[in-house]
Amino acid sequence: MKKKIGFIDLFIDEWHANNYPKWFREAPLKNEFELGYAWEEKTNEGGKPLAQWCEGLGMTPASSMKEVVEKSDCICVLAPANPEVHERLADLALRSGKPVYVDKPFAPSGKAAERMFALAEQYKTPLMSSSALRYGDELLDGKVKALEPSIFCTTGGGRSFDEYGIHQLEMIVSMMGTDVKDMTLKGDEKKLTLTLEYADGRLAQASYSLYLPFTVSAAGEKGALVLPAMNNTFQNLIAHMMTFFATGVSPIPKEETIAIASLLERSTALLHGKK
């Protein structure tokens, strides 16, 4: 019997929920899973209501969050533009013991991230969260890590750094680790550079502006690489997510996810002039 994937969302008619079903149906483990129940807390202004959305995407509208959790084998908590609601929307799922994927950004603060993992561990619930940019072909092939880079630079765009900065921080932490001792930010909401200094002296830098593509440059004593694009990010993310759903083992250490949430919290505080 195929495992059922359930969706929980703030409002269901959004880009991730609209595209994940197609990628689930094309993924390497597609024959082991099927899309099941979906629920939204509210309908987005101008968006499709749940029943209409489900009809178009081949899912079943649920009457409550509880119904999704009870009738699913694995659960996606979406709301990719609203990390402030993730802890609330994921609460029942994190008590279920079933694999739960929480969309990016995982949490609005490091403390919230810690609480979510603590709740998941209390109920023995496997938990995973990631930006798709961790899973670009160019980062998965191992060449960047093989350089043992002393400096790692990313660029990226999107509507705002608050929402899209997660992508660059995910790439940085996945390649460079979590031991960041200092952080500086220059710029404003339209353009900025964020510099991370690691405890061992390594450096990482993220540059943001609306139209910048997602790129990576890395260098160390073994050489240098310039990667002008990140390819197949979402397809690779979905493949890893489905393996997680099948095994109950997250491919990402929780320490990285918590660190990324903390770094995003700190960097946006610097951006907006908060201490």
Give residue ranges: language-model regions.
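Rossmann-like dinucleotide-binding domain that binds NAD(P)(H)
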Residues: 151-213, 255-262
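A general structural signal for well-ordered alpha-helical segments in protein cores
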Residues: 17, 113, 139, 168-169, ...
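Beta-loop-alpha module in the N-terminal Rossmann-like domain of NAD(P)-dependent dehydrogenases
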Residues: 31, 53-117
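Conserved acidic residues
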Residues: 36, 72-73, 150
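A contiguous active-site-proximal alpha/beta segment in oxidoreductase catalytic domains
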Residues: 101, 106-163
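C-terminal helix-rich "cap/oligomerization" subdomain common to oxidoreductases
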Residues: 2, 52, 56, 60, ...
